[in-house]
């Protein structure tokens, strides 16, 4: 997992408008239930419009940004210039060289990003560890050469943060269509040991209720019996970080469940609340 790109949501609006300066009744396009729920809570006066299509097609819905659809023409009959703004992911726009269309990079404290937003994951098949490692890199290479090569680009802090975010999502039995946000980060904690912090939100689709939690876990210092061995100390720290990240994500999810997040309409699948309460029916 390479280093994370900008995890924030991006407002792309006409005339340089921001979330705070969009006029009452402004039409804002997004295809994300998470963004819809938070926008309804933040700016209930806005008109939210469900949109689909690639990045260029979505930008073409905003006056002044239609030119970015020149090399990817919109489908016949697709609206153009009918919205005041659209919300996309900063990371995607940055990677496409379209950062200049962003009129506001929305603070995660204002709009919590999706779990894993801005992060990329590289996967290989188990059998490729031997086949590619030997056939492509070096016919005489030992099994696991490709895996070792990929580890060189792995950013531990990003990997740990995304592990925590996805642990929360998994515990809530939710997917990308649920109005759930989570952002974690690794910081310097006490006595030189790292701390993992997480801010997360779960909302009703209509924005009528937004649950928000911030929590953290402080790791212990590296044990004295391995502190003198850099390799052993690093291995201990890595193992401890991932275990703590998983536990933090589950802990925050459990807090949401205790608050009734699984009972919010259109939010997450019914999960075991541990109190004998019935689970709501799964949404269609």
Each PLM stretch: what is its role?
Residues 1-45, 129:
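A conserved helix-loop-strand patch within extracytoplasmic ligand-binding domains
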Residues 45, 49-284:
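Small-molecule-sensing regulatory modules
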């Amino acid at each position: 997992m390479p280093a994370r790109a900008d995890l924030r949501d991006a407002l792309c609006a006409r005339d340089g408008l921001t979330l705070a300066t969009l006029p009452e009744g402004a039409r804002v396009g997004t295809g994300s239930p998470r963004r819809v729920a938070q926008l309804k809570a933040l700016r209930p006066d806005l008109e939210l419009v469900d949109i689909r299509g690639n990045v260029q097609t979505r930008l073409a819905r905003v006056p002044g940004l239609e030119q970015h659809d020149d090399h990817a023409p919109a489908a016949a009959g697709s609206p153009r210039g009918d919205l005041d703004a659209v919300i996309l992911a900063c990371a995607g726009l940055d990677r496409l060289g379209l950062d200049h269309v962003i009129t506001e990079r929305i603070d995660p404290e204002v709009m919590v990003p999706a779990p894993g937003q801005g992060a990329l994951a590289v996967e290989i098949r188990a059998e490729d560890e031997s086949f590619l490692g030997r056939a492509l890199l070096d016919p005489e290479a030992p099994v696991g050469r490709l895996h070792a090569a990929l580890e060189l680009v792995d950013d531990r802090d990003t990997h740990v943060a995304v592990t925590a975010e996805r642990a929360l999502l998994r515990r809530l039995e939710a997917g990308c269509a649920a109005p759930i946000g989570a952002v974690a980060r690794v910081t310097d904690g006490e006595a030189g040991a790292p701390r993992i912090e997480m801010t997360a939100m779960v909302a009703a689709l209509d924005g009528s209720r937004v649950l928000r939690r911030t929590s953290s876990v402080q790791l212990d210092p590296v044990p004295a019996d391995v502190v003198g061995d850099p390799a052993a100390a690093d291995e201990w720290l890595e193992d401890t970080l991932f275990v703590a990240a998983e536990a933090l994500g589950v802990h925050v999810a459990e807090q949401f469940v205790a608050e009734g997040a699984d009972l919010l309409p259109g939010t997450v699948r019914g999960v075991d609340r541990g109190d004998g309460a019935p689970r709501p029916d799964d949404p269609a």
